[in-house]
């Protein structure tokens, strides 16, 4: 099963600690300071399969959203709300909608932070923090903190803190 790293960077690829991510699809990225210690630093950080702490992402309109493939032989360390890896391959460069859409196209659809999710009649839609979930009639829509959940007639909509449910 392919694993994915979702992260945001500045328009020039700059990230925390002055590390600059390549903005070319197919670029191999290696952590110059790799450490398998279970603490921040010493790796390439992001949200594994788009799930984790949405507060770690840059929500500004000019942020670049990256999705990187985590190869099977990459070292991965689980941190609280994020992970770090020793290397990965850039698979997508874009904005919030295109990056979360890329993950959805890869079959990663459950709880992706920032995702815009739509489900049809009697469908189920779930979005992570800052996400949007929409479901058709008799469907269920659930959104995380700061999210929006909308369901059609007879449906159920649930939103987290500061969210809106209709």
Where in the sequence are the language-model features?
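Short, glycine-biased loop/turn motifs at secondary-structure junctions and
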Residues: 1-166
């Amino acid at each position: 099963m392919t694993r994915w790293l979702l992260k945001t960077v500045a328009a020039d690829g700059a990230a925390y600690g002055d590390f600059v991510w390549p903005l070319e699809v197919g670029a191999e990225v290696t952590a110059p300071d790799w450490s398998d210690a279970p603490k921040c630093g010493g790796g390439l950080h992001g949200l594994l399969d788009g799930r984790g702490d949405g507060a770690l992402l840059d929500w500004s309109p000019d942020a670049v959203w990256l999705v990187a493939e985590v190869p099977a032989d990459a070292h991965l360390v689980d941190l609280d709300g994020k992970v770090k890896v020793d290397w990965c391959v850039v698979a997508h460069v874009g904005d919030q909608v295109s990056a979360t859409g890329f993950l959805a196209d890869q079959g990663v659809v459950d709880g992706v932070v920032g995702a815009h999710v739509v489900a049809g009649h009697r469908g189920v839609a779930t979005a992570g923090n800052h996400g949007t979930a929409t479901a058709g009639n008799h469907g269920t829509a659930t959104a995380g903190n700061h999210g929006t959940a909308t369901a059609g007639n007879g449906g159920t909509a649930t939103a987290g803190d500061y969210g809106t449910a209709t």
